[in-house]
């Protein structure tokens, strides 16, 4: 068959670097790994590799794993199984590089095979290379694999896509690796307690998009179970604390976002692995007042076809037949989010001299503040007229709706006065009093 066309098709599935890395990690978790290490080097012979201490593969198992659409008939649909079509290893790897190698240790022996698109393009045949011992020993991080009783090492090389698109390969490569680390932290956050994932020897940070440990501040809605064709979908609504009240530790658990607005909505999980997030999936719920609501939806792998999970395992579509059932579970969290957003529980600091004064009339005049009074008395008639025009524009065109939305979405209190220096305040008061005298 036309191997060149097949491999070209696998490369075009649409992985990002981060989603491709996540697909390789899926295989490690499916192999019951308790430790996963990521290593990379962008210099003379660039490589990216994922090493795990999973169950490893025999020669026959490795040969099957390297085939596009590998046989998955022996794979159990259990919580630890994250595979889908038998394409992930090949499609994810080839989406990022022209050559990838898999070395695996089982029964005390390391075996390795590789695909090189340069060779396949030339021969137009699906040529799978079996590495000899010398070639195996030359693989990056192979000594780490040798130390495990069992395990697997996936190595990417020949990064043609990055080379063709990047102004500076080294900078782009390092950036993509750093982005994949953040992506990994979120996508596999529910495995943090059971599986240790390292990037260059440093364990990834803990993430929690729901702040489940913020007892008394975060609110958890009622857990709902939806039966679909005998399989159970679990829905748990969460309402985060108001943005202005988040502690540094909570911000870190959320990934230190610039805004929590874009992270509202459904968090879809397949076997505890995060598939998609930050969207209401066209259910018409997204709004400023709902931004604190996050809905955990656990989908069993038995319902993959119902949810139309894609090859990359990075998106899914909510079926119409269960939309209404899920929306009922969502409503409680949305109500809580609106209540929390309207009443954030954070007061503005009291100040001695207010630039803005809250009054019942709609004209919002600010003429009576001490600094404006002093300035008005110090000016001549022509300057007073210009000041009057400027103040009128400020009073009439206050962007109150933009201020409301921006302040509700801010992670800190805007112009709270907390950073106002005492010395600066004293100097301004003295200047005003001098004019008043």
Question: Can you describe what each PLM-predicted range is?
Answer:
Residues 1-34, 39, 44, 60-63, ...:
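Bergerat-fold GHKL ATPase/HATPase_c domain
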Residues 67-70:
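Mobile ATP-lid/nucleotide-binding loop of the nucleotide-binding subdomain
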Residues 75-191, 195-199:
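GHKL-type ATPase core
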Residues 176, 216-437:
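Charged regulatory segments coupled to nucleotide-binding catalytic modules in large multidomain enzymes
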Residues 183-232:
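Accessory nucleic acid-recognition modules appended to NTPase machines
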């Amino acid at each position: 068959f036309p191997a060149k066309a097949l491999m070209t098709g696998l490369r075009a599935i649409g992985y990002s670097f981060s989603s491709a890395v996540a697909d390789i990690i899926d295989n490690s978790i499916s192999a019951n790994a308790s430790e996963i290490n990521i290593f990379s080097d962008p210099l003379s012979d660039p490589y990216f590799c994922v090493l795990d201490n999973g169950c490893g593969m025999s020669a026959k198992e490795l040969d099957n794993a390297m085939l596009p659409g590998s046989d998955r008939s022996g794979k159990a649909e259990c919580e630890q199984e994250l595979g889908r079509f038998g394409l992930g290893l090949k499609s994810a790897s080839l989406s990022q590089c022209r050559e990838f190698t898999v070395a695996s240790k089982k029964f005390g022996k390391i075996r390795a095979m590789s695909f090189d698109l340069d060779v396949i393009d030339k021969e137009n045949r699906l040529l799978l290379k079996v590495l000899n011992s010398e070639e195996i020993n030359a693989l990056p991080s192979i000594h780490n694999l040798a130390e495990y009783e069992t395990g697997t090492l996936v190595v990417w090389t020949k990064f043609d896509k990055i080379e063709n698109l990047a102004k500076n390969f080294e900078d782009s490569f390092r950036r993509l690796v750093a982005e994949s680390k953040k992506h990994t932290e979120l996508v596999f956050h529910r495995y943090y307690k059971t599986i240790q994932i390292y990037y260059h020897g440093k364990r990834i940070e803990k993430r929690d998009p729901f702040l489940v440990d913020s007892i008394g501040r975060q609110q958890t809605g009622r857990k709902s179970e939806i039966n679909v064709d005998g399989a159970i979908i679990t829905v748990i609504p969460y309402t985060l604390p108001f943005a202005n009240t988040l502690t540094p530790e909570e911000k870190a658990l959320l990934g230190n976002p610039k805004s929590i607005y874009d992270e509202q909505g459904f968090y879809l999980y397949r076997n505890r692995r995060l598939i998609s997030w930050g969207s209401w999936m066209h259910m018409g719920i997204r709004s400023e007042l709902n931004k604190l609501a996050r809905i955990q939806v656990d989908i069993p792998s038995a319902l993959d076809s119902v949810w139309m999970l894609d090859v990359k395992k990075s998106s899914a579509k909510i079926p119409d037949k269960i939309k209404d059932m899920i929306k009922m579970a969502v409503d409680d969290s949305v109500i809580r989010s609106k209540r929390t957003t309207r009443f954030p529980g954070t007061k503005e600091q009291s100040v001695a001299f207010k630039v803005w004064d809250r009054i019942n009339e709609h004209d919002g005049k600010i003429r009576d503040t001490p600094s404006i009074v002093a300035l008005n008395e110090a000016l001549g008639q022509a300057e007073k007229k210009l000041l009057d025009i400027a103040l009128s524009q400020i009073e009439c065109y206050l962007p109150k709706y933009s201020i409301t939305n921006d302040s509700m979405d801010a992670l800190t209190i805007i112009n709270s006065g907390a950073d106002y220096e005492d010395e600066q305040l004293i100097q301004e008061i003295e200047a005003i009093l001098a004019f008043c005298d």
